[in-house]
């Protein structure tokens, strides 16, 4: 049976959101496919999103960027981390190639760590990158166009393909770029069930608050009450607010809660934006102007969904009631149909 080894970046949950639907489609097409997932993402989150059976291995195929919050990049710390990661690059790649040979991998799919690609290329194993961004462009934006940036780009450029999920960064300098349609696992709208369980009066709004898997939270306990609005928050935030509802108490998958919400408050991120457009959920997002992926994501959501930008200060103070009312008064576009997972699964099946 073929063995697919999948590397998923731990820099936020968007990488899991892009990869999970593809692995589920592959399992449907090839039930005997052996899957190994290497990631720093907690196994509990991986299992909540990936429904195909897989073996978990902890692993770091990239270091992303050092962050002080969900919005703020630590440039100096990131530069130092990359220098350390690349200090003995040849030995690191050799170790990676040895591990992949020991796993008897038939194909390597990486979202979007470049070390697994380099290891696969040295071991002669077919490999592809998948993502809406790449770390060469992100690193270059913050740390400059130097030898490290060139080495990262080289790993991506030598893959059999870079499957660029839409919406995504342009990546014009990659000769192996293969654009694919949006990727999302769309939940089921179970709002009537939620209304009964929570005993919500008619017209009550549920607003989901998400940081996309990056540490940090908004000070919801400081937000003023908005008549007819309830906040869906995660348990780890320990929010004390009369209108807060803890997600985990609802015993419903995150995707179903997402699809059952009246709005999403988030930072610009692939999983959040695409799942919102596919679920027909309006979005309030806080500006993340320096993140290079943001312009492509925002332009796409403005075209295919409903969204409004709110300032960081407005979110810290809870001063956005008028923006919510505005977005709820607008006509809702037709939900996006995400075809990217099928496209990528078909592409991989042809090569297994």
PLM features: residue spans?
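Short amphipathic alpha-helix
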Residues: 16-26
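Donor-nucleotide binding loops and adjacent catalytic segments primarily
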Residues: 23, 183, 189-263
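Conserved nucleotide-sugar phosphate-binding/catalytic loop shared by glycosyltransferases and other
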Residues: 32-87
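Conserved nucleotide-sugar donor-binding subdomain of glycosyltransferases
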Residues: 72-107, 115
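Conserved nucleotide-sugar donor-interacting segment of glycosyltransferase catalytic cores
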Residues: 95-153
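A donor-sugar binding/catalytic signature common to diverse glycosyltransferases
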Residues: 107-111, 253-296
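A nucleotide-sugar donor-handling region in carbohydrate enzymes
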Residues: 138-216
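C-terminal amphipathic helix plus adjacent low-complexity
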Residues: 321-352
